[in-house]
Amino acid sequence: MRRRTNIAKQDNRKPMMNGAIRAREVRLIGAEGEQLGVTPTSEALMQAENLNMDLVLISNQEPPVAKIMDYTKFMFEQKKKQKEAKKKQAVVSVKEVRLSPVIDQNDFDTKLRQAIKFLEKGDKVKVSIRFKGRMITHQDVGRQVMDKFAQATKEVAVVEQRAKMDGRQMFLQLAPIKK
């Protein structure tokens, strides 16, 4: 069985314009933003055509609000606003640094430098220690390593989540200090 598709169906993301507006009357706003009152849709379309512009449905109230404007310019401005809003959103990712409960000092320093680099870039850092075999019985050693790591990064980071066990792993969450 084939599905019927409505060819005349308007894309929901784009506002309805010109002939796609099915209301009998619209509350009309002029090209300069002035209120022109409630007018029949056919008359509003003629006014828009006389100005070589489009009639765009702004709000679907009772009666619907339509504005005479240049549709391509309107869509360009909308896309521009969306891009600006997207730029202003801060993208924070979580980077992971894996340690061992019996980590050597040189390895610890390397992981510390790596974590500081992530924090300075503005990313959060998740520090994890995996306990293998019988090391699970020495969780205090892992907690000491975590505390040492948190202490070493206190100038560039704040502890967002204290060290806690989850199965055979211990986690610590660090967030960059806001400037």
From Swiss-Prot:
Q: Which GO terms describe its cellular component?
A: cytosol; membrane
Give the main location.
cytoplasm
Would I find Lipoprotein among this entry's keywords? no
> Where, subcellularly, is it found?
Cytoplasm
Gene Ontology MF annotations: ribosome binding; translation initiation factor activity
Q: Does the keyword Membrane apply?
A: no
Question: Which GO biological process annotations does it have?
Answer: ribosome disassembly
The alphabetical list of record keywords is: Cytoplasm, Initiation factor, Protein biosynthesis
InterPro entries xref list: T_IF-3_C_sf, T_IF-3_N_sf, Translation_initiation_fac3_CS, Translation_initiation_fac_3, Translation_initiation_fac_3_C, Translation_initiation_fac_3_N
Q: How does it assemble?
A: Monomer.
Q: What does this protein do?
A: IF-3 binds to the 30S ribosomal subunit and shifts the equilibrium between 70S ribosomes and their 50S and 30S subunits in favor of the free subunits, thus enhancing the availability of 30S subunits on which protein synthesis initiation begins.
Report the family membership: Belongs to the IF-3 family.
Q: Which PANTHER family match?
A: TRANSLATION INITIATION FACTOR IF-3 (PTHR10938), TRANSLATION INITIATION FACTOR IF-3, MITOCHONDRIAL (PTHR10938:SF0)
Name it. Translation initiation factor IF-3
In which organism is this protein found?
Answer: Lactococcus lactis subsp. lactis (strain IL1403)
**Taxonomic lineage of this organism?**
Bacteria, Bacillati, Bacillota, Bacilli, Lactobacillales
